[in-house]
Structures are given as C-alpha cells and as structure tokens.
Amino acid sequence: MDVGLKRELEDKVRAGERLTREDGIALYESDDLAWLGGLAHEVRTRKNGDVVHFNVNRHLNMTNVCTASCAYCSFQRKPGEKDAYTMRIEEAVRLAKAMENENLTELHIVNGLHPNLPWRYYPRSLSELKKALPNVSLKAFTATEIHHFETISGMSASDILDELIEAGLESLTGGGAEIFDWEVRQHIVDHRTHWEDWSRIHRLAHSKGLKTPATMLYGHIEEPRHRVDHVLRLRELQDETGGFQVFIPLRYQHDFVDMKDGKVRNKLQARTQMATGAEALKTFAVSRLLFDNVPHVKVFWVMHGVQTAQLALQHGADDMDGSVVEYKITHDADNYGTPNKLTREDLLDLIRDAGFRPMERNTRYEIIREYDGPDPERREAPQPMRV
C-alpha cells in the first residue's frame, strides 16, 4: 500500500468517515500489520477506552444429532452414530446446575439440528433451566436453529421467538453466519439457512427487543473480499436495527481429528491451511475499522489461543469471551493445546498483562464489576506483528 492511500485511509478513520468495500479490500492487502493494528486500536480506544470486557459463562450443547453435515463442523453426529447424544431436559438442568457458581452470569446454548426432537423440547428446556438458574441469562440458539424450529413446528419465526422469550430467552447466539457470500457458502454449509433467513431472524429478534451477537467464520476457502462483504452486510443490517451488540470473528479450526475413532471430521481440512496469527490479527483490525456501528468486537480465545487473543486486544477487540466449559462445536481442546476453561482470575491476569483494565459484564453488557488496571511495573504489552 502506498503512502498516499495509507494517509487517505487514516484521514477517513480519524474523521469518523465510513469506509467502503474498496477500502476494506485495500486494508486486507496491506502488509503493514503494525500500522493496521494501530489504526484499529485508535477506533477501539475511542469506543471503549482502555477497557476489556468479559463475562463468566458456561456452554451447554444438549444434542449433537444433526441433519446437516457442514464441512467445517466436528460436532455433529447422525442419529444412531457412535457418540451421538441427546440430553433429557432433566439431564441438561442437572449439568447446568453442576456448572453453576456464584459468579456465573450466562448460559450459552447451541445444538445440532435434531430431526426427531419435538419443538416443545426447546421452550421447555429454557423454562426449566431458568427455574433452576433464575439469575443466569440464557443466550440460546442460532438463527439456523430458529429456522429449523420453523420447519419442525410449522410455526413462524415470530411466534417461535415469542415463546422462547416467554420461556426465558434473553439473546440469540451469533452462529450460523459463517460466510454469507454464496460463492463460498455453498461449499461449507449443509443446511437451508442462508443470508436471507439469517438476517430475517436476527431482524425479528431485534424488533422484539433482543440484542444479539454476529459472527464470521474465517480462514478456510474464503478470500478477503468475502470477509469484507460479510461485514458490510451486517453493517447495513445494523444501520436498520441497531440490534447487534458485538461482532465475533471465529478462526476455522483446521486439523480436527476425532481422538476416539481417528476420523477426520473436518471435510475442509484437505483444502485449507489454518489462518496464521498474523492473518487473525489483520481480520480483527479490518473488522473493527469497517464495522463502525457495532460497539464491541470480541475475541473467542478458545478458537485463537490465549496469546493471539491478547494480541487481538491491541488490534481492535475489546471483549474476551469468558470462562467456557465443554465447548464442542469446532474443536477438541486436547488437539490444540488451548484450554477449555479459564477462571475469572485467569482472564483478569491475561487482560492486565495485555495492558488493559478488566471490566466484568453480563449478557446485556451491563457492568457488574470493575477492576484495577495493569501494574505498570510488570506490564509487558504484546507488540503488533508484521505479516
């Protein structure tokens, strides 16, 4: 990137002028990650100061039985397949209670698209979980799951959301987005929920007062132009509804092999190489610069590792996903050397060591607890890398 274009982009960002599709592609083409990270850091600081948000949550997957066979997914099993499972509602409640502690604020629930479970299983599950954990927010179901519920129930998404909200739903999850462009999506997704339905369902959720996250799965067969297109679609929807709280880039996990039966569950593996740390940081930085109307960008350390997650905080991210138990959708922690759980104290140390002030939040981004910032005498902030 020449000096003139750099200066032009800097001027636009600092003036608060919206970046275009062409600007986004130019940013991805830059090989100066230090400059790009610094520019994204200016924006995250303008929006969120020196704060890094986190929450204490748990993940619950009530069934891994799924009609789809998405190319990136290591989680799904077909009915009757070895390791396929479906929890009874009382089992799900018992497991959730076992994960409860005095700091838990959120239960994050996603499942496979089970062909035989009745629709009523899902609102009943939420209702019983809410009774058991009345002070815990229920963030549950992807737009893909809501679309599946339409199919199995014959109900509209609007009526489905009304019932789920009555049962205790406080937010949808952001999954099922992957990459929206059909050029890529047709090769990685094996279900019927594409941009039109994904956006329709989140638009409905926002109209009913729910705030939701949005995600992007990157680092597989997509190109930078597909990432830019993905963010711009979300940005346009955010202009309309204002309902997205946070954007979450998710790095595709390349090398998953099931340790129990030796099968390669990730069908994209032979066609891709996992995104490097530098590519991950570039994705966070460009996302922060393009997605000017979303307040937060989150790094999910389970998919990036804690060191890259710390660096992402200096490249546009201001939220680090909280303590996680039993996260199963994309990878097995034993294969990647990344922990499947961090305590609140672990997160506090990671945030401070990266040079930021931790702030604990709930699902609605209401502040629960503020903490002291880093000790300047022991601070050793990660330095941006060059591609």
Segments and roles (model prediction):
Residues 35-79, 84-110:
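N-terminal pre-triad scaffold of radical SAM enzymes
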Residues 52, 56, 62, 66-67, ...:
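Mobile, glycine- and charge-enriched loop segments
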Residues 74-77, 182-186, 261-268:
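Short glycine/proline- and charge-enriched loop/turn segments
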